[in-house]
Amino acid sequence: MVEKKYHALLDDRIFFGGAADAEEAVTNEKIDVVVDLRVKEPEKVTYYRVHAPIADEAKQVEASILEAVDKVVSAYRDGKKVFFHCGGGGGRAGTVAVGTLIELGQATSVEEAEQKAKAIRNKVNVREPMKIALQNIYDK
């Protein structure tokens, strides 16, 4: 059996990984919507994808994280299977994994959610500006 390069975040309905894993996840998991977190304009694909880039600019990071997490959580709550990705599946995808776990009640703090996300996918690496933004949003 071939090992998957992407991971299930929750209930075998929310998956995450890198951009190169999207097509495989769509095929294998019957994904309904792919959320692309990369800043650059995405290439053409054959599956349904929404572009929800997480900004690098400090003043836009929180809003872009909230928008991306909302797209994932809304699709999940609508009964859809979701795959979200950034380039490599660690930074932006890890950030959205943290927010998604908190929004869906699977963690109560950024630290707890980050540890859970890392336990699922060891590539998760939430960079400092994004961690601060997550803490501003969720650790109140």
Which functions belong to the PLM regions below?
Residues 138-140:
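C-terminal domain-closing interface element
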Residues 2-81, 102-133:
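Cysteine-based protein phosphatase catalytic domain of the PTP/DSP
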Residues 79-98:
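A phosphate-binding catalytic loop at a beta-strand-loop-alpha-helix junction
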